[in-house]
């Protein structure tokens, strides 16, 4: 592809070389550069791509795209942009021939519920006969292909690459979790969404390398509703008005507020063998009853956002109902079939807020006991450890403290920090360093009516120790324990 085509509709300055230069590929990682490609220099908080120009040229880059004035060898084409990171998305859109324009784009933002909502929408669309692709916290899913990702919303170039693959694979609907950070730094610059979904907003992601304050966090979230045609929003959320203040889309709402287009009329919690979920009655645009295969009042909100979105798309209500009755999201309040006498749930809850939410949610189902099993990540905030220890000690009947991704810290030091929080309560607990042994202890000591919560790992199937990821899948551990009982 000619460089000129890649720069279409972008403000640039040709420093030297030719716009007729053929570009065989676009790269922002100098280690991946191939012969005849263009290297885009991104200025990050820790790494500056301008420092790797020499390495990129040695690997065969014939075009360098910069935002700073730097020395570049004579025989290389150089283009200067005002902001390479924001323009990376536009460059990639041009390079991949704007794949989003060939898809129906659904973007989901919110502090909690993005992953569950995206999978609910995916399941409904597939039940209605459509092919989907998903980009989010659990990775990228295109048909039967799965790619792991580092961020909830990948780098802008990678987003376009995945969208192009979806187009090639005849996908109709692309469902994307859109983080506030992605909106802030421009990873979705130039992307238009057909549907934008807002789940909720609570204080999170405030600090170094994220958002400087709550105002910045709120504003960043609201940007999605300047990028979509239809906005589907939680009208009950305290920040609903902030989300729509500068919106340019049609607004559709869900919630308990009588003004909601889809009114949450009644929620009935249900627990039976291998099922912990709810019955949701709606009024307004849809008057019906939905059985939802995920527990808690927050699941009613996630389900309502999915119902309203897919209804606006044109899915049949009977298919929406069918999909929600069997939806299962890996690592998100995931019920593992074990026994008719007690329940085991795997969930990604890995901070105080999410832990409190799931513990309070499960208490509403009146279990005999709630057993909370968790650890905390190494080389991370100690405050989180104290917080989670105290919350588990206060809200669970019994706590099992174990390992998580200890990284470069001693597991026992992390458990001791969690114990500090636990000791602020009267909660009973035990410390078991091996997660496998901890799960076995929980199952061996389960009582009728118990709900055992395995928290923190969720969809992850590894543990990280001293920089090495080792395979660890809680589902496999549970299966082995039950097979050997």
Please identify what each model-predicted range represents.
Residues 44-46, 70, 180-181, 202-204, ...:
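Short glycine-rich anion-binding loops that position phosphate/pyrophosphate groups of nucleotides
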Residues 7, 71-75, 169, 194-344, ...:
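Acidic, Mg2+-coordinating active-site environments of NTP-dependent enzymes
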Residues 62-68, 232-236, 373-374, 398-404:
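Short internal beta-strands
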Residues 7-10, 86-231, 235, 239-250, ...:
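Phosphate-binding loop of NTP-binding sites
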Residues 1-90, 94, 226, 238, ...:
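N-terminal leader/targeting and accessory segments in enzymes
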Residues 1-12, 35-38, 248, 285, ...:
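ATP-dependent carboxylate-amine ligase
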Residues 49-62, 78-87, 194-200, 215-219, ...:
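A short, gly/pro- and small-residue-rich
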